Amino acid sequence: MPSPLNHHLSCFVLSVILLGSHVSTSKIPIAPQSVCEGLIEPSVLSIDKPLENIKANRGDSLVLRCAFYASPQPTIVWYHRGKRVDSHPAAHFETLLSATNLGQSVVESALRIDCLDERTAGEYFCEATSPCTQPVVTSSTVTINKAPKSITGTCKSIRQPLESPPIVSDFTLSRIELPGGVAQLACRVRGVPTPKTKWFKIEEDESLSTIDGQPNYMHLSNGDLLIVGDEETISESFRCVASNPLGSVHQDASVIYMMA
């Protein structure tokens, strides 16, 4: 039987969804400073997986990946030669609850370079920001191997691709949460046509069961998964699948419930 706290959180979450289910979560306000000051444990934001310098052939498709250890979850912005090229708003439900303890997460972001040439080569930055800490940045220099264009290919034919396969571009890989707490797992995707996302729970025998219709899980309109803990579960794992006509990809996430 759910505890009164769990019931309260469930009602709060449900009211937010009903009132704003068709509103982008990018419009959810950043946590006020009072939330940061009220935390029992200080918030954290550090690089978990830095970007690496890459050399590749002209015409290659590349994926850059960075990851951050954070509490609360960060907003992640990508830059190429100083110009913003992609961004992912933070998962903000945890700060809306005004909790004194926030879960700790590892969040990974990916940026796809569809075709490498002089226009897409250069320096890339992956920046994470949080309302409670200073920003952190990791960078990568992407260079082209010296070889004749006739050998390595050209990007002219795919400069503006009409279609592209799905990629999970922002994802909560792991989460440490208090028993009975509310956790938001990010699953943001890119691709043309826009990929559809679907969440599954990974059972102990590694089979997949849909979260649809289960009271403690809610698939948000931006692709994220909202979880209301039941105070009895020790850990659980989930899979986000992103699909469009060009294919499908998936990422797995784990949540561990621990007392502070």
From Swiss-Prot:
Presence of the UniProt keyword Secreted in the record: yes
Cellular location(s): Secreted
Tissue-by-tissue expression: Expressed in PVT, VD1-13, RID, AFD, ASK, RIV, RIB, PVQ, DVA and RIS neurons.
S-S bridge residues: C66-C126, C187-C240
Pfam families: I-set, Ig_3
UniProt keyword annotation of Repeat present: yes
Signal peptide residues on this chain, from the entry's feature table: 1-25
Disruption phenotype: No visible phenotype. In a zig-8 mutant background, 74 percent of animals have cell bodies of ASI and ASH head neurons displaced either on the top of or anterior to the nerve ring. In addition, double mutants show defects in the positioning of the ventral nerve cord (VNC) axons characterized by axons of embryonically generated PVQ, PVP and HSN neurons from the left and right VNC drifting into the opposite cord (axon flip-over). Both defects begin at the L3 larval stage and become more pronounced at the L4 larval and adult stages.
Domain Ig-like C2-type per the UniProt entry, residue ranges: 42-143, 166-256
SMART domains reported for this sequence: IG, IGc2
Gene Ontology biological process terms, A to Z: pattern specification process
Entry keyword set: Disulfide bond, Immunoglobulin domain, Repeat, Secreted, Signal
Any one GO cellular component localisation term in the record: extracellular region
Physiological role: Together with zig-8, required postembryonically to maintain the position of ASI and ASH head neuron cell bodies and ventral nerve cord axons of PVQ, PVP and HSN neurons by preventing their displacement that could occur during body growth and movement. May act by reducing L1CAM-like protein sax-7 (long isoform) adhesion.
The protein's name: Zwei Ig domain protein zig-5
Taxonomic source organism: Caenorhabditis elegans
